[in-house]
């Protein structure tokens, strides 16, 4: 029998429902695993282990509640999501001592469903990064190889799930920040459609791009978490009131992929794609064909502009969103200021890291008088063309598949002196955020050169997460799940 910490969320929830496992035992198993692995992995920031144990004991005393689908299940939450009474730093010195008085909507829904919050996960500062090396507090290590990065910016979430520290984690995806670390750590990572999950209580980076999604050990786990956190919230004006599909029912809708048309974009299989990623993803597509799917060649011609468009839009929105952190009402306040302007300048210079400062300055530049039309307005126009490419492609196919990342996890420090190259590695994920569509990263093997996990990205139509999950579930059953990393 597998160790408790190595089970899936689905297996754990079933054991809790059957009474063969108590909430305290589930929480204790994860705490023990945290104590065993966290000194090496560094996935977590604030922890609440004693509080979680107390909550679990109270739940056991009250008895199992069938109305709560995640009753007693220990989870972690990315440190960009507000948690009442628990520090929410966004991985930044400027918010080092900030403790919110409210929960983000997604966190509230986890709690209402019976989940037990164990910890906040490490992240690139304000979600600006692809390696979780840009946190102000620690560098997170990939559980499959501690010399390598876990991806980012939700690297702490992916590492905590891969290491068995929890059964699921909430991350955020602005340009691939759930899907890429999930790929690097051998997890399932789901970015829902923009507006499917409330962003209330999420500290914004790119308001038109950000979306909250789960990192889990199986597709069914992702479906269970999404079913809990999805749905309308009047506090977020961008949150859709469209009815939420029955994601668990969708998993049982297919036994194979007969009749499914999979679009394969030429632009996702060209220069820059590593041989080991190419091999794993093509083998996964071959298995999809064996299951009855038809591969359709498609084109997403404007994806070649996606990097430029994304970084113009994201940095402009970051410049605006992060203007609120000035040392006046909350966050870091400089002790070296003789005037109010100096307070603003010094507080932000001391509180923000280099990468955040770089993006704020670039964002301010593209929004400035004389450059707005040349950069931001043009980027917005091309963004629309990117969405139109997807709409046209989906006339020929039901889902689109390609690599989640052109490479596997790189070694720590390999990209630190070359931020541009790191930006370019987002090429396969950012178009989806610009279009606001859903995507899922599914583990499909291990690279022959690096020995690291590889993820296949499955992209879908707006609000059609049910199809993504059903397709991924069938593929997962054929390929097999990636187990917990042994550290």
Swiss-Prot record:
NCBIfam families: gatA (TIGR00132)
Family stated for the protein in its record: Belongs to the amidase family. GatA subfamily.
Protein name, entry field: Glutamyl-tRNA(Gln) amidotransferase subunit A
Catalysed reaction equations from the record: L-glutamyl-tRNA(Gln) + L-glutamine + ATP + H2O = L-glutaminyl-tRNA(Gln) + L-glutamate + ADP + phosphate + H(+)
GO cellular component, one term: glutamyl-tRNA(Gln) amidotransferase complex
Entry keyword annotation includes Metal-binding: no
Source organism per UniProt: Oleidesulfovibrio alaskensis (strain ATCC BAA-1058 / DSM 17464 / G20)
Function: Allows the formation of correctly charged Gln-tRNA(Gln) through the transamidation of misacylated Glu-tRNA(Gln) in organisms which lack glutaminyl-tRNA synthetase. The reaction takes place in the presence of glutamine and ATP through an activated gamma-phospho-Glu-tRNA(Gln).
Keyword list, A-Z: ATP-binding, Ligase, Nucleotide-binding, Protein biosynthesis
Catalytic residues, chain numbering: 78 (charge relay system), 153 (charge relay system), 177 (acyl-ester intermediate)
Record GO terms (molecular function): ATP binding; glutaminyl-tRNA synthase (glutamine-hydrolyzing) activity
Assembly notes: Heterotrimer of A, B and C subunits.
EC number(s) per entry: 6.3.5.7
GO biological process, one term: translation
UniProt xrefs under Pfam families: Amidase
Enzyme class: ligase
InterPro entries from the UniProt entry: Amidase (IPR000120), Amidase_CS (IPR020556), Amidase_dom (IPR023631), AS_sf (IPR036928), GatA (IPR004412)
């Amino acid at each position: 029998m597998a160790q408790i910490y190595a089970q899936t969320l689905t297996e754990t929830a079933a054991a809790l429902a059957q009474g063969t496992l108590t909430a305290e035992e589930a929480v204790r198993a994860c705490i023990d695993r945290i104590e065993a692995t966290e000194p090496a992995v560094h996935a977590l920031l604030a922890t609440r282990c004693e509080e979680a144990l107390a909550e679990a004991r109270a739940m056991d005393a009250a008895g199992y509640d069938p109305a709560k689908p995640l009753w007693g299940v220990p989870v972690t939450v990315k440190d960009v999501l507000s948690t009442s009474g628990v520090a929410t730093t966004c991985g930044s010195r400027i918010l080092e001592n900030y403790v919110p008085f409210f929960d983000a909507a997604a966190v509230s829904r986890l709690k209402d469903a019976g989940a037990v919050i164990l910890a906040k996960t490490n992240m690139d500062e304000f979600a600006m990064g692809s390696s979780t090396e840009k946190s102000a507090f620690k560098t997170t290590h990939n559980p499959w190889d501690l010399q390598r990065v876990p991806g980012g910016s939700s690297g702490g979430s992916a590492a905590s799930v891969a290491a068995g520290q929890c059964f699921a984690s909430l991350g955020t995806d602005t340009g691939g920040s759930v899907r890429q670390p999930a790929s690097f750590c051998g997890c399932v990572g789901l970015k829902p459609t923009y507006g499917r999950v409330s962003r209330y209580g999420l500290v914004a980076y790119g308001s038109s791009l950000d979306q909250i999604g789960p990192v889990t050990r199986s597709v069914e786990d992702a479906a269970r978490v999404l079913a809990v956190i999805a749905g309308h919230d009047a506090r977020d004006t961008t949150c859709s009131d469209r009815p939420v599909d029955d994601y668990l029912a969708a998993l049982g809708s297919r036994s194979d992929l007969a009749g499914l048309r999979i679009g394969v974009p030429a632009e996702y299989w060209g220069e820059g794609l590593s041989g080991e990623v190419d091999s794993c993803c093509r083998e996964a597509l071959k298995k999809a064909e064996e299951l009855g799917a038809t591969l359709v060649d498609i084109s997403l011609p404007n994806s070649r502009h996606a990097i430029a468009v994304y970084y113009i839009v994201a940095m402009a929105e970051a410049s605006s969103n992060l203007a609120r952190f000035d040392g006046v009402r909350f966050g870091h306040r400089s002790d070296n200021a003789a005037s109010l302007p100096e307070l603003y300048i010094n507080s932000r210079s001391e509180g923000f890291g280099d990468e955040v400062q770089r993006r704020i300055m670039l964002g301010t530049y593209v929004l400035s008088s004389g450059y707005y039309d040349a950069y931001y307005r043009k980027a917005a126009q091309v963004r629309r063309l990117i969405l139109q490419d997807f709409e046209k492609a989906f006339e020929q196919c039901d889902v689109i598949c390609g690599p989640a990342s052109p490479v596997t996890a790189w070694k720590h420090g390999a990209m630190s002196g070359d931020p541009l190259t790191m930006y370019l590695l987002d090429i396969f994920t950012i178009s989806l955020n610009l279009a606001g569509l859903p995507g899922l990263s599914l583990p499909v093997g291990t690279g022959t050169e690096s020995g690291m996990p590889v993820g296949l990205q499955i992209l879908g139509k707006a609000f059609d997460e049910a199809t993504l999950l059903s397709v991924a579930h069938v593929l997962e059953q054929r390929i097999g799940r990636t187990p917990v990393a042994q550290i």
